Amino acid sequence: MAENKQNDLLWKNISSLPYFRGFLRAVEGRYYRDISLTSPLLDLGIGDGHFSATTFPGAVDFGIDPSYKSLQEAFSHQAASTLCCAKGHRLPFPDAYFSTVVSNSVLEHIPDLKEVLIEVRRVLKRDGDFIICVPNDQFTQNLSVARLLNALHLRSLAVWYQRLFNKISRHYHPDSVQEWQRNLSEAGFQIVKTWNYFPPKSLAILEWGHLFGIPAWLNKQLFGRWILFPKMWNLWPVYKWLDSHYRMDQTAQDGAYSFFIMKNA
């Protein structure tokens, strides 16, 4: 393998998640290796805790999520020192408490986005860091089936497919980069750095993985885990296939996701 198992983000993700989701999380996790995270740190929307536990183990001081069931999984992963069941628009923390807030693939799922952004700014220290990953409007534009339908001039079917995929993904905000920048700036954040990632070829892996990942979904429903046999002998073919993509630079202008590093101005 390119790295030993302890440090290999791709292996750690695909050995415990559906391969398509694990691939995306490994790409995102790799970006965090070059980012300094200052304590106290809040993970906004920690979910099942897998991303935090895998990407920055032991670094998260508080993790919040509205789902108690997800927090039970986060507890089993030891994803944060303290876990709280709460919603993002009403955070149970004092003003200017955190030095860093991270939110990975969460904000797009929140209808009342502006309220949450205002609340994040309240609990973040002056000049504190706010780091997020979100899909942009190229997520639907780059879907392979939609592009094929558009090429065949079946535009209404393409739009239907794009809307269906957004619904499956539970996206309330598949917004353009410009819209994200405007909403973040209006909430009082200074964007220090941003880039797009996950080009069309990588998105196709995610897209088709929703179909081919059905066995993993059944495993989760029946046995409580995505991967029944997380061993290299079992996952070697998919690991080698994904590793060839993972080794490539995933930063791309036409990327379906956007990474933002911000300061509380």
Provide a role label for each language-model segment.
Residues 87, 106, 197-198:
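Residue-level "edge-of-site" marker
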Residues 262-265:
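C-terminal beta-strand of the catalytic ATP-binding
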Residues 1-90, 94, 100-102, 117, ...:
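Conserved N-terminal segment of class I S-adenosyl-L-methionine
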Residues 90, 108, 139:
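Active-site micro-motifs of SAM-dependent methyltransferase domains
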Residues 114-119, 129-260:
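S-adenosyl-L-methionine-dependent methyltransferase catalytic module, highlighting the catalytic core
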Residues 102-111:
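A short SAM/SAH-binding and catalytic strip from SAM-dependent methyltransferases
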